[in-house]
């Protein structure tokens, strides 16, 4: 005879699949970041950037500081970020930005264009770059 008080098996499976899915996403980020780190150009401090990205992902942090690392490119960024500081690097372009991003500091780089900016963006600092114009930014309240 089967016990009556057993919880349904699907409850545990949903949690297992959710955890597995999160682990897969984390592993995808990590493998991309390892490859990006291996392709470092002289003068870049990608090892420090990798460590900061990894800690941000593991701790589900919403703020990421990759400033002053001599970076010429960025890897794909975690989706949960709402604040990014990539100032004082040598970036000529930015990757696709997280949809929930509220603050972006990309000042003192070599940007000549910006990717599509998230509608959630409230603050942007792109001073000291090679930008001639900014796209329309309806939700931004502070521009530098």
Which ranges hold each PLM region?
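Thr-biased low-complexity repeat/linker tracts and other Thr-enriched repetitive architectures
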Residues: 88-92, 112-113
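N-terminal capping/linker segments that flank leucine-rich repeat
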Residues: 1-74, 79-81
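Ankyrin-repeat and related helical/solenoid repeat scaffolds used for protein-protein interactions
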Residues: 117-144
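Conserved hydrophobic beta-strand positions in leucine-rich repeat
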Residues: 64-66, 84-86, 104-106, 124-126, ...
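Canonical leucine-rich repeat
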Residues: 74-77, 94-97, 114-117, 134-137
């Amino acid at each position: 005879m089967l016990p009556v008080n057993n919880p349904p098996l699907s409850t545990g499976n949903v949690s297992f699949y959710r955890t597995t899915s999160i682990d897969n996403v984390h592993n995808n980020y990590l493998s991309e970041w390892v490859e990006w780190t291996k392709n470092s150009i002289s003068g870049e401090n990608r090892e420090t950037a990798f460590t900061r990205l990894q800690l941000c992902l593991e701790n589900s942090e919403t703020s990421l500081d990759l400033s002053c690392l001599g970076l010429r490119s960025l890897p794909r960024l975690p989706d949960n970020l709402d604040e990014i500081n990539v100032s004082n690097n040598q970036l000529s372009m930015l990757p696709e930005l997280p949809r929930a991003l509220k603050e972006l500091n990309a000042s003192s780089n070599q940007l000549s264009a910006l990717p599509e900016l998230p509608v959630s963006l409230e603050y942007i600092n792109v001073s000291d770059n090679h930008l001639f114009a900014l796209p329309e930014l309806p939700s931004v309240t502070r521009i530098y």
